[in-house]
Curated annotation (Swiss-Prot):
This is Proheparin-binding EGF-like growth factor. It comes from Gallus gallus (Chicken). Residues 82-108 are annotated as: Disordered. Residues 19-167 are extracellular. Residues 153-212 form a propeptide. GO terms for cellular component: cell surface; extracellular space; plasma membrane. Keywords: Cell membrane, Disulfide bond, EGF-like domain, Growth factor, Heparin-binding, Membrane, Receptor, Secreted, Signal, Transmembrane, Transmembrane helix. Gene3D superfamilies: Laminin.
Length: 212
């Protein structure tokens, strides 16, 4: 009967050591657990090392004496003890990120949206970072630093000088032509009258001579 109890204890010790080793490797933060296994047997407590050899170790009760009773009723109860860990205070990263985001937005913010919102009266504001001053892109028909000046279209009346000159030239040409024609007619008439007078004089002379 003692041999069976020893064998069962050895097998349970091996299983517990394997489980403790695996749990220690897979636990959070990779820390090893306490390497001690407590065996509860019939009201007594026995301490067994997790690295004990598989065969040859006999678990003894604190009160001493050999194990007795049924093997099924004397199966050990296994409990694991772990080292207490200190409280971990989480780092506050939210405020830092918000501050950084706020600073980044402040650098990229366009002053024309707030400070120089009403700088351009009739145009679009454009902030020039190299000069550190705003500039205005004026709408058609406006000018000035703030697009406050209005350009009024000036209509030039059609010039009548060219028409007058042309009419004067045409009048002079027509007048000259008329004068030339009139002069030619007068000369032709005078010439014809002179020829007629000469013929009459000759006829008169011839008539006088015939009468004599």
């Amino acid at each position: 009967m003692d041999g069976r109890v020893v064998l069962i204890h050895a097998l349970l010790t091996a299983v517990c050591s394997a489980a403790v080793g695996k749990f220690g490797r897979d636990g959070p933060h990779g820390e090893a657990l306490h390497n001690e296994v407590l065996l509860h047997e019939g009201g007594g407590v026995a301490s067994v090392s997790a690295t004990a050899p598989l065969l040859g170790g006999i678990v003894e009760k604190e009160g001493g004496g050999a194990a007795s009773g049924d093997a099924l009723s004397e199966l050990p109860r296994v409990a694991f003890l772990s080292k207490p860990q200190g409280p971990v205070t989480p780092k506050k990263k939210g405020n830092g990120n918000k501050r950084r985001k706020g600073k980044g937005l402040g650098k990229k913010r366009d002053p024309c949206l707030r400070k120089y919102k009403d700088f351009c009266i009739h145009g679009e504001c454009k902030y020039i970072r190299e000069l550190g001053a705003p500039s205005c892109i004026c709408q058609p028909g406006y000018h000035g630093e703030r697009c406050h000046g209005l350009l009024l279209p000036v209509e030039h009346p059609p010039s009548t000088y060219d028409h007058t000159t042309a009419l004067a030239v045409v009048a002079v040409v027509l007048s000259s032509l008329c004068l030339v024609i009139i002069t030619a007619l007068l000369m032709f008439r005078c010439h014809k009258r002179g020829v007629y007078d000469v013929e009459n004089e000759e006829k008169i002379k011839l008539g006088i001579t015939v009468n004599h």
